[in-house]
Amino acid sequence: MHQKTVAEISAALHAGEISSRELTDSLLKRIEQFDPRLNSLITVTAEQARAAADAADARLRAGEAGPLTGVPLVHKDIFCTDGVATTCGSRMLEPFRAPYDATVVRRLAEAGAVMLGKANMDEFAMGSSNETSYFGPVRNPWDLDAVPGGSSGGSAAAVAARLAPAATGTDTGGSIRQPAALSGICGLKPTYGRVSRYGMVAFASSLDQAGPFARTAEDLALLLGGMAGLDERDSTSVDHVVPDYSESLNRSIRGLRIGVPKEFFGEGLDADVRSRVEAALQVLEGEGAELVEVQLPNMELALPAYYVIAPAEASSNLARFDGVRFGHRCADPQDLEDLYKRSRAEGFGDEVQRRILVGTYALSAGYYDAYYRKAQQVRRLVADDFRQALDQVDVLAGPTSPTPAFDLGERADDPVQMYLSDIYTLGVNLAGLPGLSVPAGFSRGRPVGLQLIGGYFDEARLLNVGHKYQQVTDWHKQVPEGFE
């Protein structure tokens, strides 16, 4: 049953072919057996999961179940979970237990989903490889010497290894789509405001968005339906109708115009990745879609703009972790200043400290206009490029990441090379658009992802295109060796 998709598991649960408790126990055994090789989970909530599974089975017997009732999943450890550790992959929050559930956690629990545990992640979601976690790096199920992508690498690795059929993640500059691509699964970054950020520990508030991981676009449709919608506790949540995302999955894509940005196929794109993505585009063309070359002339400016805006917002958001109210507190501080300095120096890792320093500098007097304000102006140019391109076509398509998964430690000492991992994804966050990554083959045994980008609140169309692609390909059915 661990090889089944969310949709298949849901059907089996409703047909009485298996109980949620049986499925949950089976997956908990898989986690115990396989996760020591991956380190994909920080916390396993076995007792809580079994209780939730029993409650789901009662709902199923009573005929009160929905499509996610009884379906196990893991949550990225950036979402607050009542009474369960929420660490953000950091020593700073190692002792933190939230007194409430994040809206994403609450909504999925109300839908009957069963939380198996909390997934490992780059510290405070800052990273592209899941190597910055205080709890150790996550390994890629396809190659244990490779990274799974980041920052939601634990979520992606758990789904790829069949430890859970689904997971939640967050995407600030590619942190759902990039690990989905590198781990050979599907990941959706919804439109900014589509899913509540309440209870999601903030990295960069104008960029962060929660979304789901699964092995198929069909599964993502079910998960997004359970997560999306207005939340009055999140001022950035948008009151926009939530459609039945499953309803439009099987629509024909004949005549659909797919824009192919030439900037996504330039210098820096791995030749194997280019070949796999071009083959995927030909598959969509074979299904009746029309490929149209488009331009995003300011895309080369997206990376430097992002790495001003995101650290600036992070430096503000992470100022709250000071050793006074919650989180790590240094021993025997001499005075308040010593408490601040040592608690933050001990609690934050190198990459987080680097970004706090960059962000503080960008916001400082005398540099605000030269850096932060200028970056926001570039952000508008990038968003305008996407708008103009999407005025000509229905969706955009290209590679999710410029390379397949790289080796653990390969880029640890080269921040710029690490940041370039997100060069095709972070513009979508600057613009606030939805983006989807689906498996598109392999390069030297490591997965490659196809990225689809849509207009605001057009997740249904992206899922439709992704589903039609997966109906005529089988990359999503491949299983990492040793995790069968």
From Swiss-Prot:
Belongs to the amidase family. GatA subfamily. The gene is gatA. This is Glutamyl-tRNA(Gln) amidotransferase subunit A. Keywords: ATP-binding, Ligase, Nucleotide-binding, Protein biosynthesis. It is an enzyme of class 6 (ligase). The keyword Metal-binding does not apply. It catalyses: L-glutamyl-tRNA(Gln) + L-glutamine + ATP + H2O = L-glutaminyl-tRNA(Gln) + L-glutamate + ADP + phosphate + H(+). Heterotrimer of A, B and C subunits. It comes from the Bacteria. NCBIfam families: gatA. GO terms for cellular component: glutamyl-tRNA(Gln) amidotransferase complex. One of its GO terms (biological process) is translation. Allows the formation of correctly charged Gln-tRNA(Gln) through the transamidation of misacylated Glu-tRNA(Gln) in organisms which lack glutaminyl-tRNA synthetase. The reaction takes place in the presence of glutamine and ATP through an activated gamma-phospho-Glu-tRNA(Gln). Its EC number is 6.3.5.7. Gene3D superfamilies: Amidase signature (AS) domain (3.90.1300.10). The active site is at K76 (charge relay system), S151 (charge relay system), S175 (acyl-ester intermediate). GO terms for molecular function: ATP binding; glutaminyl-tRNA synthase (glutamine-hydrolyzing) activity. Signal peptide: none annotated. It holds the Pfam family Amidase. SUPFAM superfamilies: Amidase signature (AS) enzymes. InterPro entries: Amidase, Amidase_CS, Amidase_dom, AS_sf, GatA.
